[in-house]
């Protein structure tokens, strides 16, 4: 197997296959669940709006892939600084049956100099999650500056985040290798690689993209760090490219170019 094919297979099994569109329907989510099951293995998870969790759970069970995890989003996509709303949404997501919650960090508050609200929001959302994985989206493409990206990452980790995630996919600039490196370096420098994972999201569209991100993680955190507990790709259109690279002809619906 070529290096690119090996990376493609690795990336496929780390995907949070995503549809987060205003026009999502039960039918689109059912199709997404079908896409998560491929001839070369399953994606790690699907990522959907909370209201679709019951239909997704049913579909995944019926198609024989109950191990595909269901991630959902809260405080999404704007990252407002109302802690009570973020916590209420997170509790509701857990009640719906989410396996993982991707919450948006109040990044604008941090840009305005408020570090406390982000810490408290993440801390309380993690308490609401219990054992359920909490991924925190810091919106790197809006923070832009290395100091802010690293500070947001540190706050999230100190507050109990299980993952730090680049982006919502809803702003002009999403994951970039530059931003990914900053966040991976924080995980390394804080000595939390055993407990904290990383998720680039938005803009990872090809096997070559994914291979470069994985090589960076191997370089910074070691060859044995990347696994589904420590690394995910938030993407939709990536799956078709990975399957093409692997020369597998699955008929994949493309919910967006996320």
Curated annotation (Swiss-Prot):
Its EC number is 4.1.2.4. The keyword Secreted does not apply. GO terms for cellular component: cytoplasm. Keywords: Cytoplasm, Lyase, Schiff base. It is found in: Cytoplasm. The keyword ATP-binding does not apply. Pathway: Carbohydrate degradation; 2-deoxy-D-ribose 1-phosphate degradation; D-glyceraldehyde 3-phosphate and acetaldehyde from 2-deoxy-alpha-D-ribose 1-phosphate: step 2/2. It is an enzyme of class 4 (lyase). GO terms for molecular function: deoxyribose-phosphate aldolase activity. Transmembrane segments: none annotated. One of its GO terms (biological process) is 2-deoxyribose 1-phosphate catabolic process. It catalyses: 2-deoxy-D-ribose 5-phosphate = D-glyceraldehyde 3-phosphate + acetaldehyde. InterPro entries: Aldolase_TIM, DeoC, DeoC/FbaB/LacD_aldolase, DeoC_typeII. The active site is at residues 102, 165, 199. Belongs to the DeoC/FbaB aldolase family. DeoC type 2 subfamily. Catalyzes a reversible aldol reaction between acetaldehyde and D-glyceraldehyde 3-phosphate to generate 2-deoxy-D-ribose 5-phosphate. This is Deoxyribose-phosphate aldolase. It comes from Vibrio parahaemolyticus serotype O3:K6 (strain RIMD 2210633). The lineage of its organism: Bacteria, Pseudomonadati, Pseudomonadota, Gammaproteobacteria, Vibrionales.
